[in-house]
């Protein structure tokens, strides 16, 4: 129990020879992430599938924190020759963003202040295709980002406002078949994440699937060929 088996494509056919390198990116400075192999493999398999079948579209993460999952996305952005947008305040939650978030305790607020732009850049690496968007979202959106299209987006902001803003911004810019992963949808710790996704589903008349990672990621795919 508690043991995550690796995909057959990896164990039997060595289809993902980059795994050891990506696992180091995923766990650097944060060994707890090594427990959530379901999330890592979900990212790896879906990113490779989308980028391998779509010739256009950048990657992005909204909610970079220390940069571990962004490092994984940036790895594949480099491999497939795509841009990678990284959006965060890099100082934790802004007070205006957590107004009305009844489940956000002082402890949760403090837990995300132990980062910085400099730390995230060290973790993610210096790929020339990285685009750093610093500040509150959507104010941090650059003209280049606004004009771009996206193939894969990770939204990991925990709270309602930036998740809702992120879905509103990225969805119309997704290429057909592109995917958005929203972390913490069914974790129980962040009801604002659930609310933002559910409102988006109703408004856009779309459905996705729940992934079985530790915090219950909700995965959306843009319709079309």
What name fits each language-model region?
Residues 41-54:
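Conserved alpha-helix/loop element of class I SAM-dependent methyltransferases that forms part
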Residues 1-7:
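N-terminal auxiliary segments of SAM/dcSAM-dependent transferases
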Residues 10-37, 52-225:
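S-adenosylmethionine/decaboxylated-SAM
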